[in-house]
Amino acid sequence: MMIYAYSELYLNDAQIFLAKAFDYALNDCQQSPDWFAPIFARSSICRQLEMGSPSIISGKAGEEAVKELLESIIPGEDFPSSSFHQGRSPAYWAGWALAYNQWYTRKRFKDIFMRVPLSEILSMYKLYHEMDLTNFVTDLDIRYNAIILETK
């Protein structure tokens, strides 16, 4: 039996949380994916998400969490309200798929983004957004394992 990062009962909420968080950060706030992803991955919000904390997954909107994170990093900046997007953007899909991947593999977002940048994950949208998520997980795992990090 596979042991996942947290109960499957929270998975859908976690996927929606991260999908909306990435959509807001990249589309509404116009943040660069490869600037935003490592900042997100080092945040307490991310650590709580990785553990399946209900206070984050079900208690806070992804957009709200990102706005708080960005305001703590760039004080005084006026970040926009989230806007309605027709359909699902590549950023939304990336958040959705990455939340599933993290739940399934138990890999930390920090480790994922050190090997596979968010911009590369966004480029996978066209191929994988209509496939079963396990195809994305398999490909991401191949890319992840292909990168050997130097250790000191």
Regions found by a protein language model. Name each.
Residues 31-38, 77-82, 109-112:
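Short, surface-exposed acidic
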Residues 11, 15-68:
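N-terminal interaction modules that seed assembly of large macromolecular complexes
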Residues 4-5, 9-12, 88-106, 116-128:
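A structured, charge-rich N-terminal accessory region that forms the first stable segment of a protein
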Residues 122-152:
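Glycine-rich, aromatic-bearing surface loops/beta-hairpins
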Residues 54-86, 90:
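Long, compositionally biased
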Residues 109-116, 143-145:
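Intrinsically disordered, low-complexity tails and linkers flanking structured cores
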Residues 19-24, 42, 71, 92-103:
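Short, hydrophobic/amphipathic alpha-helical patches that form generic packing surfaces
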